[in-house]
Amino acid sequence: RSVSRGLGDVYKRQVVALCVTLFVQAKDYADYVSPLVGTQSSFELSTGNTYPAISRPWGMNFWTPQTGKMGDGWQYVYTANKIRGFKQTHQPSPWINDYGQFSIMPVTGKPEFEEDKRASWFSHKAEIAKPYYYKVYLAEHDVVTEMVPTERAVMFRFTFPENDSYVVVDAFDRGSSVKVIPGENKIVGYTTRNSGGVPANFKNYFVIEFDKPFTYEATFSNDVQPEKPDGSVPVTLKEGKLEQTDFHTGAVIGFKTKKGEVVHARVASSFISPEQAIRNLKELGGDSFEVLVQKGKEAWNEALGKVEVEGGTLDQYRTFYSCLYRSLLFPRKFYELDANGQPVHYSPYNGETLPGYMYTDTGFWDTFRCLFPFLNLMYPSVNKEIQEGLVNTYKESGFFPEWASPGHRGCMVGNN
């Protein structure tokens, strides 16, 4: 009888331990986070100054819905009611602005490239924003757009109506290139768009692969034509022309779709080379969209779960973890992994491709106070990489950074 009681106690302890383990595993810290916090801001009302950065922790690339015009530092504003595209962004603040950006936008009915004409009305009621996943219904095109990123790649899922459907790729102005490869359902290109702090050879190479053959191909280019009275540039799509290199380029591909038909786009980019962009695309592997969402959620739960808080209200939990999420975005990874899985980076200081780590997009006059001590205490393995990157910055430029984005921006203080 005493042996039975002893075994019973053991089983009870095991059940309790299992329940505790399951409770801990089931905690979704990422679901406390709202990436939309701080987005109700403007040049005149400089408060918050955030955008929904859909990414992995410290990811090389972020993705965001774009409500502002090309080049606008306030690229997503909560009070806006139209989305112009879904943009790869590296912007640390609206004042520093962006670099290496390009955008993707689904449209229906007829191909439209100009950002005002391709834009679609949306409602926050039909918008879901998580750190690892974004979904919105584009009412004017009747298209549901979803995206889930890895550190250097992203998968889009478009749910189209029965219509002539298109996807616009805008490589932005100030020097860009696009090439449509119909036989591979692929678009490749590069953007040189930046706001300073880059060498003369700076490029962000991108590759976009679709899982549906094209029935329409066109490209766009201009060489700084005179602007219209409304500030826009005349747009003429060149059907059948598959390649453009100019001041501002883009591409539009299309296909016939049935009601509810799903089309995926796999996207990656590299600051090193087109070949490295294809290598970075392998981050998606053979995973389905749903598996990538789960992996992204797990990555954020692991990072956010380093800090456990107790005793607050639900709103306080949401505030805390939304702020912690912002603390785990920058400085971002500016390195990539070579064919052997080793870190290598394009140097934003001397334009060379070099071995080792590099992080960027941080202003030391702010971040030296709290962010770096916090990372050193809570995320020492990440902070070790950041410090190695700082040493590489000194080796490649002769200085530690004051404001890096991606290279020296020569503003503010804080490097000594």
Label every PLM stretch briefly:
Residues 1-3, 18, 54, 122:
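Intrinsically disordered, low-complexity segments enriched in Ser/Pro/Gly/Ala and basic residues
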